[in-house]
Amino acid sequence: MKKDFASVTPAGKKTSVRWFIVFMLFLVTSINYADRATLSITGDSVQHDLGLDSVAMGYVFSAFGWAYVIGQLPGGWLLDRFGSKTIIALSIFFWSFFTLLQGAIGFFSAGTAIILLFALRFLVGLSEAPSFPGNGRVVASWFPSSERGTASAFFNSAQYFAIVIFSPLMGWLTHSFGWHSVFVVMGIAGILLAVIWLKTVYEPKKHPKVNEAELAYIEQGGGLISMDDSKSKQETESKWPYIKQLLTNRMLIGVYIAQYCITTLTYFFLTWFPVYLVQARGMSILEAGFVASLPALCGFAGGVLGGIVSDILLKKGRSLTFARKVPIIAGMLLSCSMIVCNYTDSAWLVVVIMSLAFFGKGFGALGWAVVSDTSPKECAGLSGGLFNTFGNIASITTPIIIGYIVNATGSFNGALVFVGANAIAAILSYLLLVGPIKRVVLKKQEQDPDQSLPV
């Protein structure tokens, strides 16, 4: 239903509701990543209380990743079928509820507690699966192409902001009240956020505060403001055959591989980094919680700056390919610096180097902007889910591989080399595989999908 905004907003002057929407995505992503990091902050205490070695801890860390990957395509389908607002709200509620329940595992015997912890981490991962594809859909519908880099980088930078804010808080809670309190506090915070999301977020054409000028600005700039119209939802049942087209597109294959490599860096910082500070650098859990926030602060700054730089390049007439690839490649080059930590005994120099590496990781984390730029209009949620599936295989492999490396060598040196090598692989993927970045146009299903897209 059309609205008359003339009495509320001056003619021709567009509202800025889209920036409130991305702020809400920022809050959701902050809680999302804080809940992922609960176990990494409490990890040393949990490992001690439950009697886990490094390999077993690696598998517990990976429980989230198994479910998160499994849930990506169903989550993407749900987003396309029922819309972003409803599915994201349910996602927030359930991952927060399962986080809350983890606070009770201390009441069980060690053997039972380990099984429950793995199961609850698995359910958190399954519940979080629609979140990032949903974020990508929301940005694609609320933002023109010229602002998507900034918008995507802003909500994506929340993963670092979450560590800056919540790592010290969770470290203090663990130190003062025990590790169980971390899960209780974070679970309650997420449930409250789910309610706020339902009360404040709408589709572009249904938002009570957006005006026609802003809608026109978004749509004329390439925003998909009708993405969640009822007609679009009716068509979602026929989208599954498009998966083959997405999986045979050379550009997308390169983006998927690079995202796996970049996510490897993410999960080192989300899982083993605080443990590394405690076990390899001799810090207390409280110190590690505060120290882990410093690289994360740099990652936050890098994340915001990377998106801004990308959009500035685009507005100055550079191609979309150039504007997206330059920050990604530059950021991954900086991330490789973490390997230098193997050659110093200074804990504070390690923090400085990791801060530089995390800044680079944030600066180059433009994958979701690329997804918004390239996803077919017919299946944006499914495309984002596929992208996140490949990327988050790293959430399974990274904690396990690092666990085996540490267990076999008694050192984190090999682990840092492994993570740094993934940054190099991401660069090579964007340089050699991705090619020009552009929106994928799908062939209709009655045509041969093998000939739909160049590889």
Curated annotation (Swiss-Prot):
Question: What does the UniProt induction comment state?
Answer: Induced in the presence of D-glucarate or D-galactarate.
Q: Which reaction does it catalyse?
A: galactarate(in) + H(+)(in) = galactarate(out) + H(+)(out); D-glucarate(in) + H(+)(in) = D-glucarate(out) + H(+)(out)
Keywords linked to the UniProt accession = Cell membrane, Membrane, Transmembrane, Transmembrane helix, Transport
Pfam families, alphabetically?
Answer: MFS_1
Q: Where in the cell is it found?
A: Cell membrane
Q: What is this protein called?
A: Probable galactarate/D-glucarate transporter GudP
To which species is this protein native?
Answer: Bacillus subtilis (strain 168)
Q: Which SUPFAM superfamilies match?
A: MFS general substrate transporter
Gene responsible for this protein: gudP
Question: What role does this protein play?
Answer: Probably involved in the uptake of galactarate and/or D-glucarate.
